[in-house]
Amino acid sequence: LGLVGSEMCIRDRYEEKMYAVGKIPGGFNKREGKASENAILTSRVIDRPMRPLFPKDYRNDVTLNNMVMSVDPECDPEVVAMLGSAIATCISDIPFDGPCAMTQIGMIDGEFIVNPTLAQKAVSDLKLTVASTREKVIMIEAGAKEIPEAKMIDAIYKAHEVNQEIIKFIDSIVAEVGKPKHAYESCAIPEELFAAIKEIVPPAEMEEAVFSDDKQTREENIRVITEKLEEAFADNEEWLAGL
């Protein structure tokens, strides 16, 4: 998964290697082939809680590779993959407002089960995934068989409580082997530039230009506005670079 342009690019790959079980795909789809649906969904589960914790003005590319070679067949590897990604990022020199942790909660006969096995998930009335930081819950993914709202809230609190223990464990690893976070050049656009743009091109005029239904008209409007701003900021190279 990745975003390019004005956003930071994070590539999050979760891949279960075929050669780990002695299979070398051939035929039309050679080698590993494209990512499976499960791999894509797992990558998204990893990406969602972690992406907002990177600095908003950070533009360096970040790649998280989760190559699954061996797993316990009774356990879902997506939780371990997310925790591995979080730990690797926390101990690296990459700026990251972590740690974060993720826990799955099931419910059988009214009792909560932390990180249920696949067999337990098959008969569970609840499939809940919760990611947390120290301060709050940052992601909830859930499916349930009409359980009471109070039970769902209790399950979220339970997962958040478990996540705090995991975060303490991550902190101990960072204290032992963590690297200092490296300095980086902020890509945030100065507030003064925003204010100057609003004076030259009022928000109403900007909205009318960019929300045109016709693509050619929209591109022409943007070109005209860009030329107007470049002319206004001709003496300010730093602001020109931000346009």
Where are these regions (language model features)?
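Mobile "lid/hinge" segments at catalytic clefts and subdomain interfaces of large enzymes
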Residues: 93-209
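Stable alpha-helical structural segments in soluble proteins, enriched in small hydrophobic residues
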Residues: 49, 80-92, 155, 162-166, ...
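Structured alpha-helical segments in the cores of large, soluble enzyme domains
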Residues: 12, 42-57, 126-131
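Glycine- and acidic-rich phosphate- and metal-coordinating loops
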Residues: 25-29, 47, 57-71, 139-141
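Noncatalytic alpha-helical scaffolds and linker/capping helices
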Residues: 189-243
